[in-house]
Amino acid sequence: MHCAQYAAGRCRSCQWLDKPYPQQLADKQHHLESLLAGHAVTQWLALVFGRESAFRNKAKMVVSGSVERPLLGMLHRDGTPVDLCACPLYPPSFEPVFTVLKTFIARAGLTPYNVARKRGELKFLLLTESTYNGELMLRFVLRSETKLAQLTAALPWLQQQLPQLAVISANIQPVHMAILEGEREIPLTEQQALPERFNQVPLYIRPQSFFQTNPPVAASLYATARQWVQEHEVHSMWDLFCGVGGFGLHCAGPETQLTGIEISAEAIACARQSAEQLGLKNVSFAALDSTRFATAEAQIPELVLVNPPRRGIGRELCDYLSQMAPKFILYSSCNAETMAKDISLLAGYHIERVQLFDMFPHTSHYEVLTLLALRR
């Protein structure tokens, strides 16, 4: 993949771009195998990868420049703006949208936030595309509500130019820190969730809910989890750190007792919407802390699925699972190092199978799916 900004030394987000893609994959596989070298793995499955470019469904654009000539992209370490509208990670459909958004910023009078001067209003634009129907979700991250009325008044023009814009919101982030978004989200359209569909499973993305940024590889990840679970005829399961419910909704059959737990109420609203659409009657989702929920339960399901943030599931949850001993633990991780530490704490389990999914080409990051079975 060629990137003009990388070649010019202006962007280093893809830190492995100089490395041939087959070598990237080999290095990731070697890294994972070295982390699990102290464990007996019954089956290593071939790694899964997708496109090298144009795979990202989401753009996070810093807004800089002036209101008349806004720039969308990032700030270089020296503070100068870098235009990323032509970033090769984005699908071709994004660049014309960015062109319209630049015009809209000027029309609406949304002054870009100046980090050095701590002045201005518009900090970021967050754009997400549905691979299911091509609809877009757009979030304006603002310092305050000062320009909200101007933004709202100008929206009809934007919606006329971009009819695929289905979900629009404003996020208020008043802090002068490198924080992408604040807690307060103000919906600006009646529709508040972007529909997505992986493997015939309907999923929904709300402004403040996490969703995978590489849809083709994410679809493979979910399909693999479903296959592994179905092979063991699991009748009851927990989906902890469940997000919008992608794993649990893929794995649950009509009779499966599924409980999904996620701290984000926005994500849980998405999961419930999907479960209702699928007609699943034995499924419940709740906005709770996954560790607190689990450790307060006196009974355990046959399978516990965990998909934690980079920090892993931690000692408390590992100790609880070791004590309660579900038949299976299905661990999906975006940080194999913390996953390996957690697995070392899970007493009484062996690794049945492991598979790497290259969700993040041109970086050292990857996703890994591991099935742990209770030793008999």
Curated annotation (Swiss-Prot):
Keyword Glycoprotein set for record: no
Family annotation (InterPro entries): 23SrRNA_MeTrfase_RlmC, MeTrfase_TrmA_AS, MeTrfase_TrmA_CS, SAM-dependent_MTases_sf, U5_MeTrfase_fam
GO process terms (BP): rRNA base methylation
Recorded superkingdom: Bacteria
Catalytic activity line of the entry: uridine(747) in 23S rRNA + S-adenosyl-L-methionine = 5-methyluridine(747) in 23S rRNA + S-adenosyl-L-homocysteine + H(+)
Molecular function GO terms recorded: 4 iron, 4 sulfur cluster binding; iron ion binding; rRNA (uridine-C5-)-methyltransferase activity
Binding site for [4Fe-4S] cluster: 3, 11, 14, 87
Enzyme class: transferase
Presence of keyword 4Fe-4S: yes
Record key words, sorted: 4Fe-4S, Iron, Iron-sulfur, Metal-binding, Methyltransferase, rRNA processing, S-adenosyl-L-methionine, Transferase
Positions annotated to bind S-adenosyl-L-methionine: 212, 241, 262, 307
Residues annotated as the enzyme's active site: 334
Enzyme Commission code: 2.1.1.189
Family: Belongs to the class I-like SAM-binding methyltransferase superfamily. RNA M5U methyltransferase family. RlmC subfamily.
Reported function: Catalyzes the formation of 5-methyl-uridine at position 747 (m5U747) in 23S rRNA.
Protein name per UniProt: 23S rRNA (uracil(747)-C(5))-methyltransferase RlmC
Gene designation per UniProt: rlmC
